[in-house]
């Protein structure tokens, strides 16, 4: 598993180290994400918004990945918890989160220049959408790539296998960002797959897979930057498995104390 966290070496070797402004932006996105996530959780408990999924534990993955993308050419297809850390693509996302969870139709209506698709509650559907977008970009000769976030549980859905197979066949410029947070609601990873890692599954589709420390935003950024270079260079897809741990609830509708071991 790739990580840049090593007390005996520089955090990120030159020339891959982002400048101070980028590092501060990543940190700000992570703090914003946890703040917004906590606020939305509390609002749900007050009965002021509907069910929502906290991002706690995945902030570094999303902020790190977003920092490696170009918001003017690349497209992001999130699941239901990443928007909190995607402010780099546009602040309208945060307005959309609040409106969506209040049941307002404008919550799923993003500005035309925002390269983030509205999230889907149905598991893994956004993976197929990302591959379709990436393939279309390739056909039209558009610059950039598509990146889709999904969880370990979504990798058990048929949509994932169909999308990954098509992406491999068509060499679509897409990045599969699998967030392995240890749990698919209450199902642990040990009961989710018999594979050595989720990253290893990529080889069956004809493209590489890597595993990265999901608590290390710079390692995630570096992995996504390499995957992006591969995608826009015409070499096809890549799967990046970011390993982290879900801190608390899957969503406001469940009770993790019923299945997660006590800390």
Per-region residue spans from a language model:
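Cofactor-/ligand-binding subdomain signature composed of acidic, glycine-rich
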Residues: 1-51
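Glycine/aspartate-rich loop-and-adjacent alpha/beta segment that forms the canonical ThDP
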Residues: 2-12, 230-263
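Cofactor-binding active-site loop characterized by glycine-rich and histidine/acidic residues
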Residues: 35-38, 42-170, 188-194, 199, ...
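Acidic, glycine-rich active-site loops and adjacent beta-strand->loop/helix elements
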Residues: 80-85, 150-156, 178-184, 215-218, ...
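Loop/turn elements at helix/coil->beta-strand transitions in domains of secreted/extracellular proteins
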Residues: 172-173, 235
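Short, proline-centered helix/strand-breaking motifs
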Residues: 173-175, 208
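Short beta-alpha connecting loops at secondary-structure transitions
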Residues: 182-187, 207-212, 257-263
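Conserved phosphate-handling catalytic cores of large alpha/beta enzymes
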Residues: 188-199, 203-239, 244, 248
């Amino acid at each position: 598993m790739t990580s840049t966290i090593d007390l005996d070496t520089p955090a990120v070797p030159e020339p891959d180290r982002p400048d101070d402004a980028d590092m501060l932006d990543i940190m700000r996105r992570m703090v914003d994400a946890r703040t917004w996530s906590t606020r939305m959780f509390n609002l749900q408990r007050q009965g002021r918004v509907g069910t929502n999924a906290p991002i706690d534990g995945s902030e570094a993955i999303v902020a790190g990945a977003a920092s490696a993308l170009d918001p003017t050419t690349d497209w992001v297809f999130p699941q239901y918890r990443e928007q909190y850390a995607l402010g780099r693509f546009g602040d309208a996302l945060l307005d959309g989160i609040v409106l969506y969870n209040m049941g307002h139709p404008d919550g799923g209506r993003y500005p035309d220049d925002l390269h983030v698709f509205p999230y889907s509650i149905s598991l893994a559907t956004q993976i197929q959408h990302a591959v379709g977008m990436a393939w279309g970009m390739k056909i039209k000769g558009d610059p950039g790539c598509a990146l889709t976030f999904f969880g370990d549980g979504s990798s058990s859905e048929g949509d994932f296998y169909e999308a990954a197979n098509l992406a491999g066949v068509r060499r679509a410029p897409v990045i599969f960002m699998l967030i392995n947070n240890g749990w698919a609601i209450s199902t642990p990873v040990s009961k989710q797959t018999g594979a050595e890692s989720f990253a290893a599954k990529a080889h069956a589709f004809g493209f590489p897979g890597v595993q990265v420390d999901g608590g290390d935003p710079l390692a995630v950024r570096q992995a996504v930057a390499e995957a992006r270079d591969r995608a826009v260079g015409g070499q096809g897809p890549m799967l990046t498995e970011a390993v982290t741990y879900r801190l608390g609830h899957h969503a406001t509708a469940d009770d993790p104390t019923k299945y997660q071991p006590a800390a």
